[in-house]
Amino acid sequence: MNLKPLSDRVIVKPAAAEEKTKGGLYIPDTGKEKPQYGEVVAVGAGKIADNGQLLEMQVKVGSKVLYGKYSGTEVSVEGEDYLIMRESDIFAILG
């Protein structure tokens, strides 16, 4: 992947959608929920504060993150799906 996010944006590779229920039933494509977690694959330099100081990003490449259902912009690069979102759209870092 050859994407470099700008400012306080991050690129997240969403987790794969569940294929089966816990009971073993297969979920059709129309019934699958979008995953709300994934792995950060690229981060921008950070946000510029009002005083001109660069604020470092709290997430790093490789972080597993939890985000909102409608967070980010979906993009497809080289056949892979990603989300581009602001760091503030991320709710938590997992584990």
UniProtKB/Swiss-Prot annotation:
Any one GO MF annotation of this record: ATP binding
A GO term from the CC aspect: cytoplasm
Gene Ontology biological process terms, A to Z: chaperone cofactor-dependent protein refolding
Keyword Chloroplast (UniProt): no
A Pfam family hit: Cpn10
Alphabetical UniProt keywords: Chaperone, Cytoplasm
Keyword Amino-acid biosynthesis attributed: no
InterPro entries: Chaperonin_GroES, Chaperonin_GroES_sf, Chaprnonin_Cpn10_CS, GroES-like_sf
Compartments in which it is found: Cytoplasm
UniProt cross-references to NCBIfam families, sorted A to Z: PRK00364.1-2 (NF001527), PRK00364.2-2 (NF001531), PRK00364.2-4 (NF001533), PRK00364.2-5 (NF001534)
Entry similarity comment: Belongs to the GroES chaperonin family.
Job description of the protein: Together with the chaperonin GroEL, plays an essential role in assisting protein folding. The GroEL-GroES system forms a nano-cage that allows encapsulation of the non-native substrate proteins and provides a physical environment optimized to promote and accelerate protein folding. GroES binds to the apical surface of the GroEL ring, thereby capping the opening of the GroEL channel.
Quaternary context: Heptamer of 7 subunits arranged in a ring. Interacts with the chaperonin GroEL.
Identification of the protein by name: Co-chaperonin GroES
Gene name tied to this protein: groES
